[in-house]
Protein backbone atom coordinates (compact mmCIF):
# COMPACT_ATOMS: atom_id res chain seq x y z
CA UNK A 1 0.00 0.00 0.00
CA UNK A 2 1.24 3.49 -0.85
CA UNK A 3 2.37 5.77 1.95
CA UNK A 4 1.36 9.41 2.29
CA UNK A 5 4.82 10.45 1.09
CA UNK A 6 4.46 8.20 -1.96
CA UNK A 7 1.13 9.77 -2.89
CA UNK A 8 2.39 13.31 -2.39
CA UNK A 9 5.22 12.53 -4.79
CA UNK A 10 2.71 11.54 -7.51
CA UNK A 11 1.19 15.03 -7.84
CA UNK A 12 1.85 16.05 -11.45
CA UNK A 13 3.03 19.47 -12.55
CA UNK A 14 0.73 21.69 -14.57
CA UNK A 15 1.39 21.42 -18.34
CA UNK A 16 2.60 24.83 -19.61
CA UNK A 17 2.51 23.72 -23.26
CA UNK A 18 -1.17 22.80 -22.94
CA UNK A 19 -1.87 26.17 -21.36
CA UNK A 20 -0.10 27.98 -24.21
CA UNK A 21 -2.17 26.07 -26.76
CA UNK A 22 -5.32 26.94 -24.82
CA UNK A 23 -4.33 30.61 -24.77
CA UNK A 24 -3.93 30.66 -28.56
CA UNK A 25 -7.23 28.86 -29.03
CA UNK A 26 -9.11 31.27 -26.76
CA UNK A 27 -7.53 34.32 -28.41
CA UNK A 28 -8.89 33.05 -31.74
CA UNK A 29 -12.51 32.72 -30.63
CA UNK A 30 -15.32 35.01 -31.79
CA UNK A 31 -14.62 37.86 -29.37
CA UNK A 32 -12.07 40.56 -28.65
CA UNK A 33 -8.95 39.22 -26.94
CA UNK A 34 -9.46 39.02 -23.18
CA UNK A 35 -13.08 40.16 -23.31
CA UNK A 36 -14.33 37.20 -21.26
CA UNK A 37 -11.96 38.13 -18.47
CA UNK A 38 -11.41 35.57 -15.75
CA UNK A 39 -13.44 32.93 -17.60
CA UNK A 40 -10.63 32.83 -20.15
CA UNK A 41 -7.96 32.50 -17.47
CA UNK A 42 -9.98 29.76 -15.80
CA UNK A 43 -10.29 27.78 -19.04
CA UNK A 44 -6.53 28.08 -19.57
CA UNK A 45 -5.87 26.94 -16.00
CA UNK A 46 -8.08 23.89 -16.55
CA UNK A 47 -6.36 23.08 -19.84
CA UNK A 48 -3.06 22.80 -17.99
CA UNK A 49 -4.35 20.11 -15.63
CA UNK A 50 -3.08 16.71 -16.83
CA UNK A 51 -6.20 14.91 -15.63
CA UNK A 52 -8.26 16.82 -18.22
CA UNK A 53 -5.89 15.91 -21.08
CA UNK A 54 -5.48 19.45 -22.36
CA UNK A 55 -9.18 20.07 -23.02
CA UNK A 56 -11.23 21.88 -20.35
CA UNK A 57 -14.28 19.76 -19.60
CA UNK A 58 -16.44 18.60 -16.71
CA UNK A 59 -17.53 15.00 -16.25
CA UNK A 60 -19.09 13.93 -12.98
CA UNK A 61 -19.07 16.41 -10.09
CA UNK A 62 -18.73 15.63 -6.40
CA UNK A 63 -18.79 17.69 -3.20
CA UNK A 64 -17.14 15.90 -0.29
CA UNK A 65 -18.37 17.12 3.10
CA UNK A 66 -16.14 16.21 6.05
CA UNK A 67 -18.10 16.00 9.32
CA UNK A 68 -16.47 16.07 12.76
CA UNK A 69 -16.84 17.43 16.27
CA UNK A 70 -14.21 19.41 18.15
CA UNK A 71 -13.14 19.14 21.76
CA UNK A 72 -12.55 22.89 21.86
CA UNK A 73 -16.34 23.28 21.93
CA UNK A 74 -15.94 22.90 25.70
CA UNK A 75 -14.27 26.32 25.82
CA UNK A 76 -17.48 28.17 24.98
CA UNK A 77 -16.38 29.27 21.51
CA UNK A 78 -19.61 28.27 19.74
CA UNK A 79 -23.27 28.87 20.50
CA UNK A 80 -24.69 25.80 18.74
CA UNK A 81 -25.09 22.58 20.75
CA UNK A 82 -22.53 19.94 19.80
CA UNK A 83 -25.36 17.55 18.87
CA UNK A 84 -26.14 19.74 15.87
CA UNK A 85 -23.23 18.17 13.97
CA UNK A 86 -24.85 14.72 13.99
CA UNK A 87 -28.32 16.15 13.30
CA UNK A 88 -27.14 18.17 10.32
CA UNK A 89 -25.10 15.27 8.96
CA UNK A 90 -28.25 13.16 9.02
CA UNK A 91 -30.14 15.98 7.29
CA UNK A 92 -27.51 15.90 4.56
CA UNK A 93 -28.39 12.29 3.84
CA UNK A 94 -31.95 13.51 3.19
CA UNK A 95 -30.75 16.22 0.82
CA UNK A 96 -32.29 19.06 2.83
CA UNK A 97 -29.27 21.19 3.80
CA UNK A 98 -27.88 24.17 1.91
CA UNK A 99 -25.07 22.31 0.20
CA UNK A 100 -27.39 19.50 -0.89
CA UNK A 101 -29.83 21.90 -2.54
CA UNK A 102 -27.08 23.86 -4.29
CA UNK A 103 -25.26 20.70 -5.36
CA UNK A 104 -28.46 19.25 -6.82
CA UNK A 105 -28.94 22.49 -8.75
CA UNK A 106 -25.40 22.09 -10.11
CA UNK A 107 -25.85 18.39 -10.91
CA UNK A 108 -23.27 17.30 -8.34
CA UNK A 109 -23.35 14.39 -5.92
CA UNK A 110 -22.76 15.09 -2.22
CA UNK A 111 -20.61 12.61 -0.32
CA UNK A 112 -21.16 13.02 3.43
CA UNK A 113 -18.15 11.64 5.30
CA UNK A 114 -18.03 11.00 9.06
CA UNK A 115 -14.42 11.61 10.03
CA UNK A 116 -15.06 12.36 13.71
CA UNK A 117 -18.67 12.93 14.76
CA UNK A 118 -19.28 12.55 18.50
CA UNK A 119 -22.16 10.08 18.36
CA UNK A 120 -22.52 6.69 19.99
CA UNK A 121 -23.35 4.87 16.77
CA UNK A 122 -22.47 5.46 13.11
CA UNK A 123 -25.09 7.51 11.28
CA UNK A 124 -26.81 5.58 8.47
CA UNK A 125 -26.08 6.95 5.01
CA UNK A 126 -22.73 8.50 5.89
CA UNK A 127 -19.38 7.28 4.58
CA UNK A 128 -17.66 6.04 7.72
CA UNK A 129 -14.04 7.17 8.08
CA UNK A 130 -14.43 8.12 11.74
CA UNK A 131 -11.10 8.41 13.54
CA UNK A 132 -12.54 9.22 16.97
CA UNK A 133 -15.58 10.81 18.60
CA UNK A 134 -14.34 14.33 18.09
CA UNK A 135 -10.86 15.81 18.22
CA UNK A 136 -9.01 16.77 21.38
CA UNK A 137 -9.54 20.13 23.07
CA UNK A 138 -6.66 22.05 21.58
CA UNK A 139 -6.75 24.61 24.36
CA UNK A 140 -5.32 21.89 26.60
CA UNK A 141 -3.93 19.18 24.26
CA UNK A 142 -3.26 18.39 20.59
CA UNK A 143 -6.26 17.82 18.34
CA UNK A 144 -4.97 14.37 17.40
CA UNK A 145 -1.79 12.37 16.99
CA UNK A 146 0.35 12.75 13.88
CA UNK A 147 -0.34 9.11 13.06
CA UNK A 148 -4.10 9.75 13.14
CA UNK A 149 -3.71 12.76 10.87
CA UNK A 150 -1.56 10.90 8.35
CA UNK A 151 -3.87 7.88 8.26
CA UNK A 152 -6.96 10.03 7.67
CA UNK A 153 -5.17 12.01 4.97
CA UNK A 154 -4.22 8.77 3.24
CA UNK A 155 -7.74 7.32 3.53
CA UNK A 156 -9.36 10.44 2.07
CA UNK A 157 -6.78 10.73 -0.70
CA UNK A 158 -7.47 7.12 -1.70
CA UNK A 159 -11.24 7.69 -1.60
CA UNK A 160 -10.90 10.79 -3.76
CA UNK A 161 -8.72 8.97 -6.28
CA UNK A 162 -11.30 6.19 -6.47
CA UNK A 163 -13.99 8.75 -7.33
CA UNK A 164 -11.72 10.09 -10.07
CA UNK A 165 -11.37 6.58 -11.48
CA UNK A 166 -15.17 6.43 -11.61
CA UNK A 167 -15.45 9.57 -13.72
CA UNK A 168 -15.43 12.52 -11.31
CA UNK A 169 -13.43 15.36 -12.86
CA UNK A 170 -14.52 18.25 -10.63
CA UNK A 171 -14.34 18.13 -6.85
CA UNK A 172 -15.62 20.49 -4.19
CA UNK A 173 -14.79 20.46 -0.49
CA UNK A 174 -16.99 21.21 2.50
CA UNK A 175 -17.21 20.60 6.23
CA UNK A 176 -19.62 20.32 9.11
CA UNK A 177 -18.77 20.64 12.79
CA UNK A 178 -19.75 22.81 15.71
CA UNK A 179 -16.87 25.01 16.99
CA UNK A 180 -14.82 24.38 13.88
CA UNK A 181 -14.23 28.02 12.99
CA UNK A 182 -12.19 28.25 16.19
CA UNK A 183 -8.66 26.85 16.51
CA UNK A 184 -9.88 23.35 15.71
CA UNK A 185 -10.72 24.23 12.16
CA UNK A 186 -9.40 27.50 10.93
CA UNK A 187 -8.21 30.43 13.00
CA UNK A 188 -5.19 28.80 14.65
CA UNK A 189 -4.12 27.20 11.37
CA UNK A 190 -4.37 30.49 9.50
CA UNK A 191 -2.61 32.36 12.30
CA UNK A 192 0.16 29.76 12.51
CA UNK A 193 0.92 29.48 8.80
CA UNK A 194 0.50 33.15 7.86
CA UNK A 195 2.19 34.46 11.00
CA UNK A 196 -0.69 36.84 11.71
CA UNK A 197 -1.97 37.49 15.22
CA UNK A 198 -5.11 35.55 16.24
CA UNK A 199 -6.97 38.82 16.77
CA UNK A 200 -6.62 39.50 13.03
CA UNK A 201 -8.13 36.20 11.93
CA UNK A 202 -10.70 35.20 14.57
CA UNK A 203 -14.30 35.98 13.62
CA UNK A 204 -17.77 35.29 14.97
CA UNK A 205 -18.28 32.01 13.10
CA UNK A 206 -21.89 30.83 13.32
CA UNK A 207 -23.23 34.02 14.93
CA UNK A 208 -21.13 33.95 18.09
CA UNK A 209 -22.11 36.96 20.25
CA UNK A 210 -19.50 39.69 19.99
CA UNK A 211 -19.06 39.75 23.77
CA UNK A 212 -17.65 36.21 23.52
CA UNK A 213 -15.14 37.08 20.81
CA UNK A 214 -12.37 37.97 23.26
CA UNK A 215 -12.60 34.49 24.79
CA UNK A 216 -12.39 32.92 21.35
CA UNK A 217 -9.27 34.92 20.53
CA UNK A 218 -7.74 33.88 23.84
CA UNK A 219 -8.51 30.21 23.15
CA UNK A 220 -6.79 30.41 19.76
CA UNK A 221 -3.75 32.09 21.29
CA UNK A 222 -3.54 29.52 24.09
CA UNK A 223 -3.84 26.65 21.62
CA UNK A 224 -0.94 27.91 19.53
CA UNK A 225 1.23 28.66 22.57
CA UNK A 226 0.56 25.27 24.16
CA UNK A 227 0.89 23.06 21.08
CA UNK A 228 3.65 24.94 19.22
CA UNK A 229 2.71 23.78 15.70
CA UNK A 230 5.50 23.97 13.11
CA UNK A 231 4.23 26.36 10.40
CA UNK A 232 6.41 24.67 7.78
CA UNK A 233 4.85 21.24 8.45
CA UNK A 234 1.23 21.02 7.31
CA UNK A 235 0.62 17.66 8.98
CA UNK A 236 1.97 18.97 12.28
CA UNK A 237 -0.29 22.02 12.14
CA UNK A 238 -3.38 19.93 11.41
CA UNK A 239 -2.56 17.39 14.11
CA UNK A 240 -1.83 19.94 16.81
CA UNK A 241 -4.41 22.69 16.24
CA UNK A 242 -6.67 21.33 13.51
CA UNK A 243 -9.57 18.93 13.42
CA UNK A 244 -10.59 15.81 11.58
CA UNK A 245 -12.76 17.78 9.14
CA UNK A 246 -9.81 20.02 8.25
CA UNK A 247 -7.61 16.98 7.69
CA UNK A 248 -10.31 15.45 5.50
CA UNK A 249 -10.61 18.53 3.31
CA UNK A 250 -6.84 18.67 2.89
CA UNK A 251 -6.98 15.03 1.82
CA UNK A 252 -9.53 15.80 -0.90
CA UNK A 253 -7.31 18.58 -2.24
CA UNK A 254 -4.25 16.35 -2.28
CA UNK A 255 -6.18 13.46 -3.81
CA UNK A 256 -7.69 15.54 -6.61
CA UNK A 257 -4.34 17.14 -7.41
CA UNK A 258 -2.66 13.72 -7.51
CA UNK A 259 -5.09 12.88 -10.33
CA UNK A 260 -4.38 16.17 -12.09
CA UNK A 261 -7.93 17.39 -11.43
CA UNK A 262 -9.43 20.64 -10.11
CA UNK A 263 -10.90 21.11 -6.66
CA UNK A 264 -13.17 24.00 -5.67
CA UNK A 265 -12.53 25.49 -2.27
CA UNK A 266 -15.45 26.60 -0.13
CA UNK A 267 -15.05 29.20 2.62
CA UNK A 268 -12.74 30.06 5.50
CA UNK A 269 -12.29 26.53 6.81
CA UNK A 270 -11.30 25.26 3.38
CA UNK A 271 -8.77 28.10 3.07
CA UNK A 272 -7.19 26.89 6.31
CA UNK A 273 -7.10 23.31 5.03
CA UNK A 274 -5.57 24.55 1.76
CA UNK A 275 -2.83 26.40 3.64
CA UNK A 276 -1.89 23.18 5.42
CA UNK A 277 -2.14 21.09 2.25
CA UNK A 278 0.10 23.51 0.35
CA UNK A 279 2.72 23.16 3.09
CA UNK A 280 2.67 19.41 2.44
CA UNK A 281 2.88 19.82 -1.33
CA UNK A 282 3.15 23.26 -2.98
CA UNK A 283 2.48 21.49 -6.30
CA UNK A 284 -1.25 21.35 -5.51
CA UNK A 285 -1.80 25.12 -5.63
CA UNK A 286 -2.57 25.33 -9.40
CA UNK A 287 -5.37 22.79 -8.90
CA UNK A 288 -7.15 24.90 -6.25
CA UNK A 289 -10.01 27.09 -7.45
CA UNK A 290 -11.46 29.56 -4.91
CA UNK A 291 -15.24 29.62 -5.21
CA UNK A 292 -16.27 32.57 -3.06
CA UNK A 293 -15.01 35.10 -0.54
CA UNK A 294 -16.05 33.99 2.91
CA UNK A 295 -17.53 36.64 5.19
CA UNK A 296 -15.29 35.39 8.01
CA UNK A 297 -12.82 37.94 9.37
CA UNK A 298 -9.58 36.21 8.40
CA UNK A 299 -10.67 35.20 4.91
CA UNK A 300 -8.67 37.79 2.96
CA UNK A 301 -5.56 37.08 5.01
CA UNK A 302 -5.72 33.37 4.18
CA UNK A 303 -6.51 33.94 0.50
CA UNK A 304 -3.74 36.50 0.14
CA UNK A 305 -1.24 34.00 1.55
CA UNK A 306 -2.50 31.39 -0.91
CA UNK A 307 -2.38 33.88 -3.78
CA UNK A 308 -5.99 33.15 -4.74
CA UNK A 309 -8.81 35.48 -5.80
CA UNK A 310 -12.38 34.12 -5.38
CA UNK A 311 -14.88 34.19 -8.23
CA UNK A 312 -17.91 35.11 -6.11
CA UNK A 313 -18.62 37.44 -3.22
CA UNK A 314 -22.05 36.53 -1.85
CA UNK A 315 -21.39 37.37 1.84
CA UNK A 316 -21.77 33.66 2.64
CA UNK A 317 -20.44 31.88 5.73
CA UNK A 318 -22.56 28.74 5.86
CA UNK A 319 -19.81 26.24 5.12
CA UNK A 320 -20.84 22.69 4.17
CA UNK A 321 -19.35 23.14 0.68
CA UNK A 322 -22.17 25.49 -0.28
CA UNK A 323 -19.89 27.95 -2.05
CA UNK A 324 -18.09 25.18 -3.93
CA UNK A 325 -21.41 23.84 -5.22
CA UNK A 326 -22.57 27.33 -6.16
CA UNK A 327 -19.44 27.94 -8.25
CA UNK A 328 -19.54 24.70 -10.24
CA UNK A 329 -21.54 26.28 -13.10
CA UNK A 330 -18.75 28.85 -13.47
CA UNK A 331 -16.31 26.01 -14.19
CA UNK A 332 -18.76 24.60 -16.72
CA UNK A 333 -19.13 28.04 -18.32
CA UNK A 334 -15.36 28.29 -18.80
CA UNK A 335 -15.38 24.88 -20.46
CA UNK A 336 -18.34 25.82 -22.65
CA UNK A 337 -16.74 28.93 -24.11
CA UNK A 338 -13.57 26.97 -24.83
CA UNK A 339 -15.33 24.10 -26.58
CA UNK A 340 -18.40 25.68 -28.17
CA UNK A 341 -17.58 29.19 -29.38
CA UNK A 342 -16.80 29.77 -33.03
CA UNK A 343 -13.46 31.01 -34.33
CA UNK A 344 -12.59 34.39 -35.82
CA UNK A 345 -10.67 32.80 -38.68
CA UNK A 346 -13.69 30.78 -39.81
CA UNK A 347 -15.67 34.01 -40.14
CA UNK A 348 -12.83 35.95 -41.82
CA UNK A 349 -12.74 38.42 -38.93
CA UNK A 350 -9.47 40.06 -37.96
CA UNK A 351 -9.45 42.09 -34.75
CA UNK A 352 -6.63 44.16 -33.24
CA UNK A 353 -4.52 41.81 -31.19
CA UNK A 354 -5.57 38.80 -33.29
CA UNK A 355 -3.67 37.65 -36.38
CA UNK A 356 -4.23 34.71 -38.68
CA UNK A 357 -0.79 33.39 -37.88
CA UNK A 358 -1.59 33.55 -34.17
CA UNK A 359 -4.85 31.69 -34.69
CA UNK A 360 -3.35 28.92 -36.74
CA UNK A 361 -0.12 28.43 -34.82
Swiss-Prot record:
Active-site residues from the entry: 320 (proton acceptor)
Catalysed conversion reaction: 5,6-dimethylbenzimidazole + nicotinate beta-D-ribonucleotide = alpha-ribazole 5'-phosphate + nicotinate + H(+)
Pathway: Nucleoside biosynthesis; alpha-ribazole biosynthesis; alpha-ribazole from 5,6-dimethylbenzimidazole: step 1/2
SUPFAM superfamilies cross-referenced by the UniProt entry: Nicotinate mononucleotide:5,6-dimethylbenzimidazole phosphoribosyltransferase (CobT) (SSF52733)
Annotated EC: 2.4.2.21
GO BP field: cobalamin biosynthetic process
GO molecular function term, any single one: nicotinate-nucleotide-dimethylbenzimidazole phosphoribosyltransferase activity
Keywords from the UniProt entry: Cobalamin biosynthesis, Glycosyltransferase, Transferase
Family listed: Belongs to the CobT family.
Function: Catalyzes the synthesis of alpha-ribazole-5'-phosphate from nicotinate mononucleotide (NAMN) and 5,6-dimethylbenzimidazole (DMB).
NCBIfam families named in the record: cobT_DBIPRT, PRK00105.1
Subunit relationships: Homodimer.
Record's protein name: Nicotinate-nucleotide--dimethylbenzimidazole phosphoribosyltransferase
Biological source species: Shigella boydii serotype 18 (strain CDC 3083-94 / BS512)
